[in-house]
Amino acid sequence: MDGIKYAVFTDKGVRLLGKNQYTSNVESGSTRTEIKHWVELFFGVKVQAMNSHRLPGKGRRMGPIMGHTMHYRRMIITLQPGYSIPPLRKKRT
């Protein structure tokens, strides 16, 4: 259950919600089958297709040393018609 980090709500992510596609960042070591099984089990939905791509880490400098943050993977999950995932938002207090 540690595979999915958080949902992504960019312009493209919001546009894809109309096509029943959900975008989220996942652990870079997770496989498609692990994420598909976890989404179907946790949310009770049927996954039709999954697309993924790896995003590069950003460069970070600490004095003369140049480093970088960890890279991560972004998954676009397409659900079968009739299924949906409730919004994943934190409540504001």
From Swiss-Prot:
It is found in: Plastid, Chloroplast. The keyword Nucleus does not apply. Coiled coil: none annotated. Keywords: Chloroplast, Plastid, Ribonucleoprotein, Ribosomal protein, RNA-binding, rRNA-binding. GO terms for biological process: translation. One of its GO terms (molecular function) is rRNA binding. Its main location: plastid. GO terms for cellular component: chloroplast; ribonucleoprotein complex; ribosome. Belongs to the universal ribosomal protein uL23 family. Part of the 50S ribosomal subunit. Binds to 23S rRNA. HAMAP family: Ribosomal_uL23_B. This is Large ribosomal subunit protein uL23cz/uL23cy.
